[in-house]
Amino acid sequence: MQFIDHATICVKAGDGGDGIVAFRREKYVPAGGPSGGNGGRGGSVILVATEQLQTLLDFRYLRLFKAQDGERGGPKGMTGASADDLIIQVPCGTAVYDAETDECLGDLTSAGQTLQVAQGGKGGLGNQHFLSNSNRAPEHALPGLPGEERQLRLELKLLAEVGLIGLPNAGKSMLISVLSAAKPKIADYPFTTLVPNLGVVRRETGDGTVFADIPGLIEGAHRGAGLGHDFLRHIERTRLLIHLVDLTAEDPIADWRTIQAELKAYGRGLSDRPQILALNKIDAVLDEDLSFWQAEFQALTPVPLLCISSADRRGLDALLRLVWQWLDELDAAAELSETRVLN
């Protein structure tokens, strides 16, 4: 399945039905009063989040969505039928923007959550509404109002608590496959991972935490280089980042600086997100070299540092203990903040 995480669509709500001009035509009442009914309401366009979709692929092929118009009014004061709303399903995690103003209209993060993106037009008034002492036989009615129309930009941001970041071939896919049941494509060359991979890592209690392997981050990713521009947005929802650095690379420190610079350049608070630095592939590094790199990175950054190997699982238990500790502390801080607001 092709992973599509952004799309632009046009939505058009239904127009309201027209009011009509009609008069009572009853036996023994040759000149009855006005009886034209109102038009029905046009259908609105509503997005609803569902767990049954994982990408925005469908919106690459169907980009125009139009709700039905309301029906015109009828004689004898009958109101025209209102149109049904048009329901459009989107994946959980879809952020919705007005494509022209860039205004965020809503963020659909949980199944069943809805967002009205275009309101149906009101029905027009029939001539019975214009009866007055000075006009006993009004000959005019109002047309229905047009429904809203707008261009929408949809962006799918993965719902993961922990994001794995690093240059291509840093070992992110291997790590997520070892920690979870995910089965990403893995090979010894850059850009093996072309789409974000999700994996659920479970604690001893059975509770699951979603990890995301974010692919394609290279120098210039925030400007669209490599695969990074499209996928940096997926880090936005994460609460904790694990930055993997390949110790077998030519210059691990330069690699670390590259990713940190991209997070800062992208903005939106990514560079301030809590991080764990994981020096990876220690199974292929001499002990004296490992000690050297540990000292170098500890002098470079204050973030927690661990040495790991997905190949022989060294350091992975310690990594998970640190992840759970961080997440628990973030939960406690969020609860404390919420309590202060309520008080």
Swiss-Prot record:
GO molecular function, one term: GTP binding
PROSITE patterns found in the cross-reference section: G_OBG (PS51710), GTP1_OBG (PS00905), OBG (PS51883)
Residue ranges of every copy of the OBG-type G domain listed in the record: 160-328
One Gene Ontology cellular component: cytoplasm
Binding site for GTP: 166-173, 191-195, 213-216, 280-283, 309-311
Subcellular location: Cytoplasm
Swiss-Prot/TrEMBL GO biological process terms: ribosome biogenesis
E.C. number(s) listed in UniProt: 3.6.5.-
Binding site for Mg(2+): S173, T193
Keyword check for GTP-binding: yes
UniProt record similarity statement: Belongs to the TRAFAC class OBG-HflX-like GTPase superfamily. OBG GTPase family.
Name of protein: GTPase Obg
Gene, per the UniProt record: obg
